[in-house]
UniProtKB/Swiss-Prot annotation:
Organism: Macrococcus caseolyticus (strain JCSC5402)
PANTHER family associated with the record: RECOMBINATION PROTEIN RECR (PTHR30446:SF0)
Superkingdom, taxonomy of origin: Bacteria
One of the GO BP terms on file: DNA recombination
Gene Ontology MF annotations: DNA binding; zinc ion binding
DNA damage as UniProt keyword: yes
Name recorded for this polypeptide: Recombination protein RecR
Keywords recorded for this protein, A-Z: DNA damage, DNA recombination, DNA repair, Metal-binding, Zinc, Zinc-finger
Family note: Belongs to the RecR family.
HAMAP family listed in its UniProt record: RecR
TM regions (residue ranges): none
């Protein structure tokens, strides 16, 4: 179908988002066309602001508009415990359950030789620095329960064990092959309380 250039450009832009195919992108583009101009300008500004105003915390790697992030700055949290997750979305999922009160470390990925992602491509070096510089007693490996997540957890556990820090893994109540961000609060809560030492 031939659309005017601005609509085609908007459809192509929407299709860059995950899970958005041509039909959905077309529906969204025409919805934008029907929106009030102020709403469209606000929407466009929100998109630009996300890229311009957010960064990654220099301590833990979580998304933030301040550095360090609000979690790293919160001295009421348990400073002796770090929960390692693959993505910032996983921090948000963990925080929703309101049970875990420690710190986080975001890897921004998982080891995946098939995709050419090795340990040096994820946020492991800064984790090791934190473990040396901070008084951490327990490291909770909350990577996804799939091949990449398990490989990443085992790799980190092998690096950390000689340091003498307790290394635990979330209890399996999480489905194998699933992503942490899609788990409900009850499942996550049971997984964190039933974590096992590696």
């Amino acid at each position: 179908m031939h659309y005017p250039a601005p609509i085609s450009k908007l459809i192509d832009s929407f299709m860059k988002l995950p899970g958005i195919g041509p039909k959905t992108a077309s529906r969204l583009a025409f919805h934008v066309l029907d929106m009030k101009e102020d709403d469209v300008v606000g929407f466009a500004k929100a998109l630009v602001d996300v890229k311009r105003e957010l960064t990654y915390c220099s301590v833990c790697g979580h998304i933030t508009d301040t550095d360090p992030c609000y979690i790293c700055e919160d001295k009421t949290r348990d400073q002796s415990m770090i929960c390692v997750v693959e993505e910032t979305k996983d921090v948000i999922a963990m925080e929703k359950m309101r049970e875990y009160k420690g710190l986080y470390h975001v890897l921004h990925g998982a080891i995946s030789p098939m995709e050419g992602v090795g340990p040096e491509d994820i946020n492991v070096p800064s984790l090791l620095t934190r473990l040396r510089d901070e008084h951490i007693q327990e490291l909770i490996l909350a990577t996804n329960p799939n091949i990449e997540g398990e490989s990443t957890a085992m790799y980190i556990a092998r690096l950390v064990k000689p340091i003498g820090i307790k290394v635990t893994r979330l209890a399996h109540g999480l489905p194998v092959g699933g992503d942490l961000e899609y788990a409900d609060e009850v499942t996550l809560s049971k997984a964190i309380t039933g974590r096992t030492e590696i």
